[in-house]
């Protein structure tokens, strides 16, 4: 199946080439259509290759038959989290356009960017005539031509035989050719919009200077730079590139609309491409034109194509890109890492959201009511940071964005599949301990020791358990600080005090330059509850710390300890917006909301737990919220998700039993709930802590319930479900508790209770 022309979507009418003037200049850049794609988009597998078999040579010859490598139909991306169907590479000849015509909707003047060559502009729309394919722009007078400059059969540079057109972009037609000097391998020739465009010619010359050094497995390979005379005899430069036989990420549906990808799939694709951008940035280059059309999915990998817009970082002059994807500040700053990060965010948005369009181009911003953004909160936060109008607030590097994308992907896949996808953070430690795990069962300790126990969560419990920012390995004091990471707060302060006095400075390191050392002191002070000293040190660090998020995190912790929950929420949210793929700020926000009595942020307990089932504090927090909202069934289900391998499994089982029965009148409880609670206790060894008191609780609830209800005859916890049997069970449980009571007074109390509840003896 051959293609008549390129994709018909509306968001990309043409690229813009903007002149990025030096900061001292005042000239505004002009728009120029510079879209540069050299592979059409194939909508589905019906467009893929059906290879014809050549005639067989019947003469006997010695031949080596190459082994055929069979690839599995499914491939895994995103660290193995996402499975996609493997696409087949497309035969080059199948990519040829049978009628290489640029649609009128995509015809723009290369000089001023205004529409040209359109029937409605020439008064021909009524009679059905088409607009002129070449002529002069009615707005600026520049000549334009949308006709191919090369024809099938043309030989370029005495080496490349042109087969035809495969795409058209702002930089002109893109041609398929066969290289006669290298076994007739298929190559791609990318020409320019117009041979008279001096800036475009200069762009091609510039490409020759630095594109040859670009070598990366995720970037299309440049083979050669050649020239060929156009129809007027003027030389036109062409870049000879590797042919990529796949399909772009821009997919069209059967109805002609742009098909959106699942969020997990889109993230997985971008995770494959970000290393290529990181590589370009490392050698001082910016890609400038990331968009779905320029990402090719092949049988074995993803590749960036079309290097026509690549430029040096902070270069000024003619800067190419696509409206709707291009960062707004690029005319002022020139190409930067931040402008590339912006295109990554816009590409993710274009792949997954129904972006608004105007005049056929994507509008800035995001559709906040899009169901994708409301369903995947972390993904929405990531997009907002990537396309922040202030480039300083975007991700600082492709590596940083990749790390956060991976965290968001884990959340998305866990949410979609219901299977936790835990992963290690690159900037936060694991949880140092747990909080709120035994709050609900702790009040049953009154059976054990006779004292009332609080069921309230405290800020200190949270602070000492929360994750903490990891030590920056580039900090001068990092080797010293690594030894104090797991120390107790007092020991940490002693070690840091010794380090400040040079006692640990054996290698002559000037620890006065360290930022991490005072931050470690802040952490230890907060663990000790000394908020005043911690805040004083944070104030001293305000002008020294480049990574402000660390200060914001510790400010939030200090606010939590002082009871300023609104300020703590604000600061934790700021950290979350900076690192949307991290679980640490989500857990902190959920715990802060619980202390404040707010329910808005309880969703983060759910997010953390469903993403990483090793953070059991989140499971118990979610269960507490569900129970408080009257959803005891949901709370029990959450507690049942704690895996048997967790050291808190027993506590979860006991808590679920208490959740079923505690704080409810007998007319709110069913026999099934009583038996369910009993089964949870019965499966645990009697030597486990708190099992005896929970047995007493269950049997006591059953005894009270039976006073007004009828029960089946089956035993419960080894006793008949009768008034006599349950009294025997409660008596036995209380006497067992009396044997392990910590004080004589409480032991006598338990024995008295047992005597009161024992069934009446008959002689």
Swiss-Prot record:
BP GO annotations: regulation of metabolic process
SUPFAM superfamilies hit by this protein: Protein kinase-like (PK-like) (SSF56112)
Binding site for ATP: 166-174, 190
Active site: 289
Signal peptide: none
PTM comment, free text: Autophosphorylated.
Entry's EC annotation: 2.7.11.1
Reactions this protein catalyses: L-seryl-[protein] + ATP = O-phospho-L-seryl-[protein] + ADP + H(+); L-threonyl-[protein] + ATP = O-phospho-L-threonyl-[protein] + ADP + H(+)
Domain of life, source organism: Bacteria
Enzyme class: transferase
Chain segments carrying region Disordered: 1-32
SMART domains referenced in this protein's UniProt entry, alphabetically: S_TKc
InterPro entries per record: Kinase-like_dom_sf, PknG_rubred, PknG_TPR, Prot_kinase_dom, Ser/Thr_kinase_AS, TPR-like_helical_dom_sf
Keyword vocabulary terms for this entry: ATP-binding, Kinase, Nucleotide-binding, Phosphoprotein, Serine/threonine-protein kinase, Transferase
Family note: Belongs to the protein kinase superfamily. Ser/Thr protein kinase family.
Protein name: Serine/threonine-protein kinase PknG
Species assigned in the record: Mycobacterium leprae (strain TN)
Gene name for this UniProt entry: pknG
């Amino acid at each position: 199946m051959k293609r008549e022309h390129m994709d018909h979507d509306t968001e990309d009418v043409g690229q813009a080439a903007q002149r990025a003037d030096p900061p001292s200049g005042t000239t505004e850049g002009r728009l120029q259509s510079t879209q540069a794609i050299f592979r059409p988009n194939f909508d589905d597998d019906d467009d893929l290759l059906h290879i014809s078999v050549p005639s067989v040579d019947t003469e006997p010859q010695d031949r080596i038959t190459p082994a055929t490598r069979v690839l599995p139909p499914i491939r895994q991306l995103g660290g193995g989290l996402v499975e996609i169907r493997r696409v087949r590479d497309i035969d080059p000849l199948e990519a040829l356009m049978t009628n290489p015509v640029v649609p009128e909707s995509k015809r723009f003047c290369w000089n001023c960017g205004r529409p040209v060559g359109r029937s409605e502009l020439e008064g021909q729309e009524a009679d059905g005539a088409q607009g002129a394919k070449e002529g002069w722009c009615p707005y600026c007078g520049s000549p334009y031509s949308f006709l191919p400059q090369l024809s099938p059969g043309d030989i370029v540079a005495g080496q490349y035989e042109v087969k035809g057109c495969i795409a058209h972009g702002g930089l002109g037609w893109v041609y398929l050719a066969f290289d006669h000097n290298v076994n007739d391998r298929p190559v791609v020739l990318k020409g320019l919009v117009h041979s008279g465009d001096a800036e475009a010619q200069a762009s091609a010359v510039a490409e020759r200077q630095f594109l040859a050094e670009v070598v990366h497995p995720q970037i299309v390979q440049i083979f050669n730079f050649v020239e060929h005379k156009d129809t007027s005899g003027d030389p036109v430069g062409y870049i000879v590139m590797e042919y990529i036989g796949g399909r772009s990420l821009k997919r069209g549906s059967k109805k002609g609309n742009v098909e959106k990808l699942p969020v997990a799939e889109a993230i997985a694709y971008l995770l494959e491409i970000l290393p290529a951008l990181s590589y370009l940035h490392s050698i001082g280059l910016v890609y400038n034109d990331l968009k779905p059309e320029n990402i090719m999915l092949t049988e074995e990998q993803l590749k960036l194509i079309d290097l026509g817009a690549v430029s040096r970082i902070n270069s000024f002059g003619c800067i190419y890109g696509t409206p709707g994807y291009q960062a707004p500040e690029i005319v002022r700053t020139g190409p930067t890492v931040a402008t590339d990060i912006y295109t990554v965010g816009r590409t993710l948005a274009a792949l997954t959201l129904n972006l608004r369009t105007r005049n056929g181009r994507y509008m800035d911003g995001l559709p906040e009511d899009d169901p994708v953004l409301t369903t995947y909160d972390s993904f929405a936060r990531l997009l907002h940071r990537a396309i922040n109008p202030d480039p300083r607030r975007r991700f600082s590097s492709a590596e940083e964005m990749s790390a956060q994308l991976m965290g968001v992907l884990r959340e998305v896949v866990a949410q979609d599949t219901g299977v936790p996808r835990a992963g290690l953070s690159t900037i936060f430690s694991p949880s140092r301990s747990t909080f709120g795990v035994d709050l609900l069962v702790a009040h049953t300790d009154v059976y054990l020791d006779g004292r009332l126990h609080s069921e309230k969560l405290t800020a200190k419990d949270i602070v000492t358990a929360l994750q903490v920012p990891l030590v920056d390995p580039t900090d001068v004091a990092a080797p010293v600080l690594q030894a104090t990471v797991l120390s107790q707060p007092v020991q940490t302060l002693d070690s840091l005090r010794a380090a400040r006095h040079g006692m640990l400075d054996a290698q002559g390191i000037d620890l006065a330059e360290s930022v991490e050392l005072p931050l470690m002191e802040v952490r230890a002070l907060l663990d000790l509850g000394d908020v005043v000293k911690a805040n004083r040190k944070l104030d001293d660090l305000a002008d020294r710390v480049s990574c402000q998020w660390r200060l914001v995190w510790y400010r939030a912790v200090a606010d939590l300890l002082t009871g300023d929950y609104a300020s703590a929420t604000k600061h934790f949210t700021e950290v979350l917006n900076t690192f949307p793929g991290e679980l640490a700020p989500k857990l902190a926000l959920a715990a802060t909301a619980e202390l404040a009595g707010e329910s808005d942020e309880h969703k983060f307990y759910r997010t953390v737990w469903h993403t990483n089932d090793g953070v059991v504090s989140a499971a118990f927090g979610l269960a507490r919220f569900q129970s408080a909202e009257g959803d005891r069934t949901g709370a029990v289900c959450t507690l049942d998700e704690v895996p048997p391998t967790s050291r808190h499994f027993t506590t979860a089982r006991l808590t679920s039993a208490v959740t079923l029965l505690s704080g409810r009148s007998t007319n709110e409880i069913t026999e099934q709930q009583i038996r369910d609670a009993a089964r949870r206790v019965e499966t645990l060894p009697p030597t486990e802590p708190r099992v005896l008191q929970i047995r007493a609780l269950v049997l006591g609830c059953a005894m009270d319930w039976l006073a007004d209800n009828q029960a089946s005859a089956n035993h419960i916890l080894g006793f008949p479900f009768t008034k006599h049997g349950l009294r025997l069970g409660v008596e036995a449980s209380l006497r067992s508790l009396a044997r392990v009571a910590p004080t004589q007074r409480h032991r006598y109390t338990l024995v008295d209770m047992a005597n009161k509840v024992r069934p009446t003896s008959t002689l």
